[in-house]
Amino acid sequence: MSIILGIDPGSRITGYGVIRQVGRQLTYLGSGCIRTKVDDLPSRLKLIYAGVTEIITQFQPDYFAIEQVFMAKNADSALKLGQARGVAIVAAVNQELPVFEYAARQVKQTVVGIGSAEKSQVQHMVRTLLKLPANPQADAADALAIAITHCHVSQNAMQMSESRLNLARGRLR
């Protein structure tokens, strides 16, 4: 059993999603947004750090998964996003959590089956996969999708390792 915290970073709204994985079974534990309503960036970063730390304390995850930085058209926005990611990662590292990063395209490909999927498609698939009563808020859905991606990637990696081990032992399944 593993608990995975997914983070969709943003300097104004940071989405989070927490799921439990037991084998192939995924269970929704919680999700939401850390909203930073203050204007100055250092205060927003402090709120993100405190919010992520509080979520880690509440849910005690085993793994921390976060969206990678993408190339933005606006350099200022990209820098702020990078700083928001940084404080979220520091919160995880301070709690000694292993950190995994996934590209947005990989997350969409894993959850929806199309790397260029729209936000509404991600919300719908997250709702379906986790058997939620309604679509989660967009940032929370993205964070849950990141956590789901981590589950699939880590499970596939374990299966490949087992296959390699069996091959090395002369057994093919």
From Swiss-Prot:
GO terms for cellular component: cytoplasm; Holliday junction resolvase complex. Its cofactor is Mg(2+). One of its GO terms (molecular function) is crossover junction DNA endonuclease activity. Its EC number is 3.1.21.10. Gene3D superfamilies: Ribonuclease H-like superfamily/Ribonuclease H. It catalyses: Endonucleolytic cleavage at a junction such as a reciprocal single-stranded crossover between two homologous DNA duplexes (Holliday junction). It is an enzyme of class 3 (hydrolase). Mg(2+) 2 binds at E67. InterPro entries: RNaseH-like_sf, RNaseH_sf, X-over_junc_endoDNase_Mg_BS, X-over_junc_endoDNase_RuvC. GO terms for biological process: DNA recombination; DNA repair. The active site is at D8, E67, D139. Mg(2+) 1 binds at D8, D139. It is found in: Cytoplasm. Binds 2 Mg(2+) ion per subunit. Keywords: Cytoplasm, DNA damage, DNA recombination, DNA repair, DNA-binding, Endonuclease, Hydrolase, Magnesium, Metal-binding, Nuclease. CDD domains: RuvC. Belongs to the RuvC family. The RuvA-RuvB-RuvC complex processes Holliday junction (HJ) DNA during genetic recombination and DNA repair. Endonuclease that resolves HJ intermediates. Cleaves cruciform DNA by making single-stranded nicks across the HJ at symmetrical positions within the homologous arms, yielding a 5'-phosphate and a 3'-hydroxyl group; requires a central core of homology in the junction. The consensus cleavage sequence is 5'-(A/T)TT(C/G)-3'. Cleavage occurs on the 3'-side of the TT dinucleotide at the point of strand exchange. Homodimer which binds Holliday junction (HJ) DNA. The HJ becomes 2-fold symmetrical on binding to RuvC with unstacked arms; it has a different conformation from HJ DNA in complex with RuvA. In the full resolvosome a probable DNA-RuvA(4)-RuvB(12)-RuvC(2) complex forms which resolves the HJ. This is Crossover junction endodeoxyribonuclease RuvC.
